[in-house]
């Protein structure tokens, strides 16, 4: 006769498997476990972005701030390789960029998103359910009356699946998305780039490295690039104004997706402070001022480069001034100063006789072919002078350059002599 033996202890593998299957009907439980791990691993990654927003339930949970932040999208939203504008995750991200709840979002150029890959997420969800199944068995060892061997088996599976989940999260969250607007007259597009998990970095560091390498997050801004931005991306506005405050300029960087994405306000301030040492070319030129009086006269005006200037203290009220406007004021200031000074002279010669005339040329006065300095000429003397048109002959000349105003004086020479 056959003998049969019945094990009175439950099969721990079957108990874990049954619980994991039940969780298929409750996806929130697995998602909550994934989110918990994301917060534990990525919540301290603010050294790369000003803030990390992990799995916000709605776009209203993402603050409208003027600093660049990373949004790790909730695992209920996933991206397939060929997803278009009508996919659920793309529509959610677009809505998050455009609005914060019922209000329009102001700082649209400050958000970067990280999204799970659809295929990888399915594997992660399955692993997470299996982990939770074995975790239930481990936590219920006493109630299930598990043997020492069964408890060890549960512990082994929990540890193994725990490590697998952490590894799978890194390979699952691979899609970086951010708004880009090539044409300011058209709506922004969402650019999707895959990030690599081959370098052992956290998700936050991986995204930061990728977006910085792609030139989509600027951590250091050269003054020349800032000048080019004023003349190109902001050209339509820059052409209509004489100046703008740094506070307004920073707002343009954070609001519009066609502007470079600066990592922080410090990046802009550093570029402005360092411009005093940089020779700017046409298409890059701008000046700085601490303010302007009621008559529109700029105060603390700096026309780069300026060896005599000290790095300015940049505030929201600091003015970025159009180069031509700043130069016109400085030229007028120099002309007024020169009216009371001697020594800035040009030695001009027509190879027959030498004539001494004052600088700048706009103040040259000639009386009976004898040039006199415009400096200190009285109204009576000026009324008795007669302007004489010099013959079209060859002239040579020299000018004394002051070290504290060499840029403006050289520019004057170029405009008055070379460009004429």
Label every model-predicted segment.
Residues 1-419:
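Extended alpha-helical scaffold and adjacent linker segments that couple domains
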